[in-house]
Amino acid sequence: MKPQDLKLPYFWEDRCPKIENHVFYVPSYYPKYEEFVMPSWQNLFANEGPVCCELCSGNGDWVVEQALKDTSINWIAVEKRFDRVRKIWSKMSNHKVNNLLIVCGEAQTFFTHYVTDASFQKIVVNFPDPWPKFRHRKHRLFQDVFVQDMVRVLVEGGQLTLVTDDHTYLTNSIQVMLNYLSPGMQDPYYVNVKDNYGGSWFENLWRSKGEKIFCTEFVKRVGI
């Protein structure tokens, strides 16, 4: 299957939440999110295995590799750009991956309206846009409200991982996560990832430019 074989299932004026071809479409600026009844993960994946979630999935190289590596774990790939969703879907289809659901939409909207408490064993955020300019800071993913939402959907003992090439974004995000989660690494709470992290297109891009790759991990405290 080619990326262009996946067609958007509605025109903008007819947009609505919809699951089709292993893609969950979560449109922007939609006033009736709550009218869509989200199936359980067990129904979506046809099993009761653990569910992990990748945010900022890009072209899908990393998450498809993870899904193929261990088919007992279910994965959700969240990517807001439809051109990238198409590429993830193409890889998923060609590799016959059955333990992956793609979410086409904003992570915040998906979590707020469709992810119940204690849903995920792990959340991995790979190379999010750092929005480095101060006037764009409201767009940054690692802000208090959304970090609290990520904590909400993690199981007790669940893990939140951030991988980025932007050191300033890394340290700012760590300061936010320290308010709600326990660090999984010793101070300064991150490592420089020297080995191949898993075939991410963005990892390959930044390494080709000589950039360092940083990783931090946090764990949900019992009782949160």
UniProtKB/Swiss-Prot annotation:
PANTHER family: 3-DEOXY-D-MANNO-OCTULOSONIC-ACID TRANSFERASE/TRNA GUANINE-N 7 - -METHYLTRANSFERASE, PENTACOTRIPEPTIDE-REPEAT REGION OF PRORP DOMAIN-CONTAINING PROTEIN. It catalyses: guanosine(46) in tRNA + S-adenosyl-L-methionine = N(7)-methylguanosine(46) in tRNA + S-adenosyl-L-homocysteine. One of its GO terms (cellular component) is tRNA methyltransferase complex. GO terms for molecular function: tRNA (guanine(46)-N7)-methyltransferase activity. Keywords: Methyltransferase, S-adenosyl-L-methionine, Transferase, tRNA processing. Catalyzes the formation of N(7)-methylguanine at position 46 (m7G46) in tRNA. Substrate binds at K133, D165. Pathway: tRNA modification; N(7)-methylguanine-tRNA biosynthesis. SUPFAM superfamilies: S-adenosyl-L-methionine-dependent methyltransferases (SSF53335). Gene3D superfamilies: Vaccinia Virus protein VP39. It holds the Pfam family Methyltransf_4. Its EC number is 2.1.1.33. Belongs to the class I-like SAM-binding methyltransferase superfamily. TrmB family. The active site is at D129. S-adenosyl-L-methionine binds at E54, E79, E106, D129. This is tRNA (guanine-N(7)-)-methyltransferase.
